[in-house]
Amino acid sequence: MKIAIASDHRGYPTKQELIKYLSKKNYEVLDYGTNSTDMVDYPEYAFKLGESVANKKVDFGIVVCGTGIGISIACNKVKGVRCAKVDNIKEAELTRKDNDANVLALNGSMPLYRVKDIVDVFFNTNFTNVDRYINRINQIKEYENNNVTKKFEEKEVRNDA
């Protein structure tokens, strides 16, 4: 399995530990930066990783920043990416089973043992292919492709009292 990984400066130490961990588990790991704890802006790294996932150059991605929130927001701007900010193994399992997430976002302050458990569950859980989940993912894809139906358009709000 080929894994892309990226972080900002606050996620860098966790990213480096994850690269070692994943390599020992025989995953092929592509590092999209950053390469130090010097302050950087996470969107650049999130977009690079997201493009590699969307273009199927890798099977999955992992992004890490101080909270996991900002980098996940940036990653989700890439068409075809379904990035989930995960804090525990239950969320890791469900985001794969129900949402077919292809990028995992992590908090760089989380203990490494917990990060490893989350990563293992994420990579070892398959999408369920249940119709209702497929339908929801297809709605997201449709929206991304600008095939938005009227029900998603903004409606005028009237305050007639």
Give the predicted meaning of each segment:
Residues 4-24:
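Glycine-rich phosphate/diphosphate-binding loop of Rossmann-like nucleotide-binding domains
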